[in-house]
């Protein structure tokens, strides 16, 4: 039985992950954590998310170290925000707790700081911009398309709900990274266009970020050439696609002693 702690426990992803863990054989929720001074601190997390009493009370991140130690958590799942996630990763690593990180929007410095803590404390972590199985097949397909259609004009379009705080999405940025890694030419990443931009250069890869409504996550990469256009799309209709991948990552990282992994490792795509 893998003992799991979840931060951002009352968020959209956190509450969904808790519910899915409880439905999954071999996994158990032992701690649920949210922001400091949360008014619901001490209340049963199951009752707070509407699934009935679980016997696990909501804790807050300012007491994370003691909660991890007292609960015996083996894996911590974090879908929060960059700054608190870095702090959480440092504390969890110090406590010998493995990590599943789905937070996006890190600066290079934040990511380096987090990875340093993971390596220094010799724990295991999966870090991914998107845990959906379909998205990772999308990523794998992009490798081939970039290799074969590298001379085409490439544009990336993503759309998310109006509450998303970072732009472009981590998934769109990862798609751009994969394309750049597999192109046989120089490339230049830009974000949207405005004004008199002049003709499009061959080196441009442009990301367009759209926000509105309750869109869970749409991503399309366009390869355009004279006379034809190829579009590769992934559209998420619910967060269950992400949550299913998180469960696979929890099981995967629960068997590892140390190292940083991604969803290609989890799914055997490397």
UniProtKB/Swiss-Prot annotation:
The active site is at residues 160, 164. Pathway: Amino-acid biosynthesis; L-lysine biosynthesis via DAP pathway; (S)-tetrahydrodipicolinate from L-aspartate: step 4/4. (S)-2,3,4,5-tetrahydrodipicolinate binds at residues 161, 170-171. GO terms for biological process: diaminopimelate biosynthetic process; lysine biosynthetic process via diaminopimelate. Its EC number is 1.17.1.8. It catalyses: (S)-2,3,4,5-tetrahydrodipicolinate + NAD(+) + H2O = (2S,4S)-4-hydroxy-2,3,4,5-tetrahydrodipicolinate + NADH + H(+); (S)-2,3,4,5-tetrahydrodipicolinate + NADP(+) + H2O = (2S,4S)-4-hydroxy-2,3,4,5-tetrahydrodipicolinate + NADPH + H(+). InterPro entries: DapB_C, DapB_N, DapB_N_CS, DHDPR_bac, NAD(P)-bd_dom_sf. One of its GO terms (molecular function) is NADP binding. It is found in: Cytoplasm. NAD(+) binds at residues 8-13, 34, 102-104, 128-131. GO terms for cellular component: cytoplasm. Keywords: Amino-acid biosynthesis, Cytoplasm, Diaminopimelate biosynthesis, Lysine biosynthesis, NAD, NADP, Oxidoreductase. Catalyzes the conversion of 4-hydroxy-tetrahydrodipicolinate (HTPA) to tetrahydrodipicolinate. Belongs to the DapB family. This is 4-hydroxy-tetrahydrodipicolinate reductase. The gene is dapB.
């Amino acid at each position: 039985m893998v003992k799991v702690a979840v931060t951002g426990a009352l968020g959209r992803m956190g509450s969904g992950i808790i519910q899915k863990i409880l439905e999954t054989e071999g996994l158990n929720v032992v701690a649920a954590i949210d922001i400091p001074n949360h008014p619901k601190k001490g209340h049963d997390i199951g009752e707070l998310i509407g699934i009935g009493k679980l016997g696990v009370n909501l804790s807050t991140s300012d007491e994370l170290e003691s909660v991890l130690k007292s609960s015996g958590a083996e894996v911590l799942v974090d879908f929060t925000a960059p700054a608190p996630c870095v702090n959480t990763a440092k504390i969890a690593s110090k406590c010998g707790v493995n990590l599943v990180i789905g937070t996006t929007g890190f600066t290079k410095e934040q990511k380096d700081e987090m990875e340093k803590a993971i390596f220094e404390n010799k724990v295991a972590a999966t870090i991914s911009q998107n845990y959906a199985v379909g998205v990772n097949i999308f990523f794998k397909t992009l490798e081939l398309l970039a290799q074969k259609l590298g001379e085409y004009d490439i544009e990336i379009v993503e759309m998310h709900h109006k509450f998303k705080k970072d732009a472009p999405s981590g998934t769109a940025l990862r798609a751009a990274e994969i394309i750049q890694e597999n192109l046989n030419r120089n490339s230049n990443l830009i974000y949207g266009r405005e004004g008199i931009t002049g003709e499009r250069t061959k080196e441009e890869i442009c990301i367009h970020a759209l926000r509105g409504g309750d869109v869970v996550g749409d991503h399309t990469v366009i390869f355009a050439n004279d006379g034809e256009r190829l579009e590769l799309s992934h559209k998420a209709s619910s967060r269950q696609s992400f949550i299913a991948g998180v469960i696979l990552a929890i099981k995967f990282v629960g068997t590892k002693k140390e190292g940083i992994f991604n969803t290609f490792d989890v799914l055997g795509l490397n």
